[in-house]
C-alpha cells in the first residue's frame, strides 16, 4: 500500500491540519530502495523517524493502520521525541505477526524468488482474485479500486518486485517482534487513540482493547461496517475521531 490509503481521511479532516502521508517501501512504492537498505520492521521504523527528522516536524500526531500501526508501536517504544500523540488504527499487534490468513500467505510468497513472486502476483490483476480472503478480501470492503492501483508497481517493475521480496523476508523474520514491542508500550506517556474495526477478520478486535488497556493515556473507539483498512472503508468516521482527538 502507499500514501493514497489516507486520501479520503485527509480530504475529510477539518481545515487547519498539516497532513504529511509518506509512502514507505511496502511494495506499492515507485522508486527502488538501495541494495543495502534495511527493510526489516525496525529498519522501516528508523526510516519513518528519519522522515520526521528531515522535515523537522514536532508535536506530530502519528497515525498508523495495518503494518503502519506496527511501525508506530516500534517508534513508541523508542521514545519518539517528535511525536505528541499516536493513533493506532486496526493494526498488527502482539502475536498476530504475520497477521491473519492474509499475512501468512504473504510471508510464504516472500520465500519465492523475485521472478516467481512476480508471476504469482500477476493473478492480482483480476478483481475476483484480489477479493479473496488471502488477498485484500478481508482487508477492505470498499477499496478494490485503490488496492488495484497499489498492485501496479509490483506488477510492472522488476526492481519493486525485488524490494517486495526483501521486505517480506525481512519483516517476517522476527515473529515475536510485536510481543516485545508491546512490553514497552506502558512506558509511552503521551495520549493515544486506538481505533478498531469491530468486524475486523485480520486484526482481532480483542487486540484493540488490549492495546487501549496497555497504553496509560489511551482510549478505544470501535468502527462498524469496516474491515482492517478503515481509511478506505470509513474515511469520514476516521477523520472525525482523529480530528476530535488531535484537537
Where are each of the predicted segments found?
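C-terminal alpha-helix
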Residues: 241-247
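Alpha-helical elements of the RecA-like P-loop NTPase motor core of helicases
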Residues: 3-7, 162, 240
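Conserved HGGG/HGGXW glycine-rich cap/lid loop of the alpha/beta-hydrolase fold
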Residues: 1-31
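Conserved catalytic core of Hanks-type protein kinase domains
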Residues: 12, 214, 232
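Flexible "cap/lid" subdomain of the alpha/beta-hydrolase fold that forms the substrate-access gate
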Residues: 20, 25-57, 63, 70-196, ...
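Glycine-/small-residue-rich active-site loops that bind phosphorylated ligands and cofactors
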Residues: 1, 173, 200, 227-229
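Generic recognition of short, well-ordered alpha-helical segments
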Residues: 4-8, 100, 206, 210, ...
